[in-house]
């Protein structure tokens, strides 16, 4: 009788082997989850289609009971170079992590910018806090006449010819957000005409309408 009991114990051991096999299956499922992370990295590869500009990186400190805790902030502008742009602000203990957070926030703030022949439809001014940015259309070949923070936003938005001037605060955060406010305020000739109840010819130059009819708008 003791012998069969040992064989029964051996059978139980076999069942335990099956359980370990099940554990192997679970490990396989964890590997599948890893595949999900690979898909996430694939999405990260798709981000190469976007233009990312780090405008400024600052080190900040928080005073706590035990001393100071340092971290980094990053102001990032992201666009596709074809009329879509957004700005984000990230904060983390390491610079790469702060930039990554800024990029993700910028993508959540994407919006479309009206363009005609690589420039803006009309002059406009944007304000944010003490920062003021003035933008004016320019003829083809002029280039982007702008300072660092303004240039980063305009180039990410796909604007190739524009004149700009920054007034007031020289803080990069204020300047970037003032530029974003200016771009958000841009309107197409059709939108202005509809708001005023006038024909399009009465609110836009003939050359602008010809360029728009030629299919060079965005």
From Swiss-Prot:
Residues 26-46 have a biased composition (Basic and acidic residues). GO terms for cellular component: small ribosomal subunit. It comes from the Bacteria. Residues 1-46 are annotated as: Disordered. The keyword Metal-binding does not apply. With S4 and S12 plays an important role in translational accuracy. Belongs to the universal ribosomal protein uS5 family. The N-terminal domain interacts with the head of the 30S subunit; the C-terminal domain interacts with the body and contacts protein S4. The interaction surface between S4 and S5 is involved in control of translational fidelity. This is Small ribosomal subunit protein uS5. It comes from Kineococcus radiotolerans (strain ATCC BAA-149 / DSM 14245 / SRS30216). The gene is rpsE.
């Amino acid at each position: 009788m003791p012998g069969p009991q040992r064989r029964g114990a051996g059978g139980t051991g076999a069942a335990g082997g099956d359980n370990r096999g099940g554990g192997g299956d679970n490990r396989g499922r964890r590997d599948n989850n890893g595949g999900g992370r690979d898909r996430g990295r694939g999405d990260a590869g798709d981000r190469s289609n976007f233009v990312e500009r780090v405008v400024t990186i600052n080190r900040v400190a928080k005073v706590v009971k035990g001393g100071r805790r340092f971290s980094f902030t990053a102001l990032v502008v992201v666009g596709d170079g074809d009329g879509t742009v957004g700005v984000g602000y990230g904060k983390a203990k390491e610079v790469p992590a702060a930039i990554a957070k800024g990029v993700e926030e910028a993508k959540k703030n994407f919006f479309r910018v009206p363009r005609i022949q690589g420039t803006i439809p009309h002059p406009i001014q944007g304000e944010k806090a003490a920062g003021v940015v003035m933008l004016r259309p320019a003829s083809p070949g002029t280039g982007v006449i702008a300072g660092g923070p303004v240039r980063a936003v305009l180039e990410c938005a796909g604007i190739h010819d524009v004149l700009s001037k920054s007034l007031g605060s020289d803080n990069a955060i204020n300047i970037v957000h003032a530029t974003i406010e200016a771009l958000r305020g841009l309107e197409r000739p059709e939108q202005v005409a509809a708001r005023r109840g006038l024909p399009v010819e009465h609110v836009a130059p003939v050359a602008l309408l010809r360029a728009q009819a030629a299919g060079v708008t965005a």
